């Protein structure tokens, strides 16, 4: 009987102690991380869509045998820059210039690199063309053909492709370019 009473008492005390801990009203705060907020206010005719500001254009995979001569190109891959909240009373047209590391052999092309320590392809660069199929030198000063702005949303269309500068060797062929807008 004593044993049952002792077991019952211990079980009751554990339950009460557990309930006391669970009901602790003292809040606990811990560091959860950092959230970065980025944005920009612009005094311009339009605002660049957030989806257009940072995008990836997948050019695809090609055999080195596709490049048999200097100037050979791959298929053009379309991409666009979307402008929101445009007011054609502020500016009637928009144009884009791209900036990036130029290829050493052909400065009209972006130089390719590898994203990690992988082998980088050689003998090719990336060519950017505007909606009139005019190549855009990645110098930050060669602007695309002007596009007339309409009220609201406007889409500026471009293409990109690989272009041979020499005999191609296999490897990753990536590049980054920034762009600036010109409103007139």
Curated annotation (Swiss-Prot):
Single biological process term from Gene Ontology: cell adhesion involved in single-species biofilm formation
Family per record: Belongs to the fimbrial protein family.
Keywords attached to this entry: Disulfide bond, Fimbrium, Signal
Domain of life where this protein originates: Bacteria
Compartment annotation: Fimbrium
Keyword Acetylation among UniProt keywords: no
Name of the protein: Type-1 fimbrial protein, A chain
Cystine crosslinks: 46-86
Organism taxonomic ancestry: Bacteria, Pseudomonadati, Pseudomonadota, Gammaproteobacteria, Enterobacterales
Stored Pfam families: Fimbrial
Known function: Fimbriae (also called pili), polar filaments radiating from the surface of the bacterium to a length of 0.5-1.5 micrometers and numbering 100-300 per cell, enable bacteria to colonize the epithelium of specific host organs.
InterPro entries from the UniProt entry: Adhesion_dom_fimbrial, Adhesion_dom_fimbrial_sf, Adhesion_dom_sf, Bact_Fimbrial_Adh_Pro
Signal peptide boundaries: 1-22
Keyword GTP-binding: no
Gene Ontology CC terms: pilus
Regions that span the bilayer: none
Organism: Salmonella typhi
């Amino acid at each position: 009987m004593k044993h049952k009473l002792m077991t019952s008492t211990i079980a009751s005390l554990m339950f009460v102690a557990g309930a006391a801990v669970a009901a602790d009203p003292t809040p606990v705060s811990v560091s959860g991380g950092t959230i970065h907020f980025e944005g920009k206010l612009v005094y311009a005719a339009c605002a660049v869509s957030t989806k257009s500001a940072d995008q990836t254009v997948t050019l695809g995979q090609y055999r080195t045998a596709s490049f048999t001569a200097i100037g050979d190109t791959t298929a053009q891959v379309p991409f666009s820059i979307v402008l929101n909240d445009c007011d054609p009373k502020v500016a009637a047209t928009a144009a884009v210039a791209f900036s990036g590391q130029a290829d050493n052999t052909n400065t009209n092309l972006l130089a390719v690199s590898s994203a990690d320590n992988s082998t980088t392809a050689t003998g090719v660069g990336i060519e950017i063309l505007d909606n009139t199929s005019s190549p855009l030198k990645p110098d930050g000063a060669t602007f695309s053909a002007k596009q007339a702005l309409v009220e609201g949303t406007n889409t500026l269309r471009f293409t990109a492709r690989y272009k041979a500068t020499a005999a191609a060797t296999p490897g990753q062929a990536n590049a980054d370019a920034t762009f600036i807008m010109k409103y007139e």
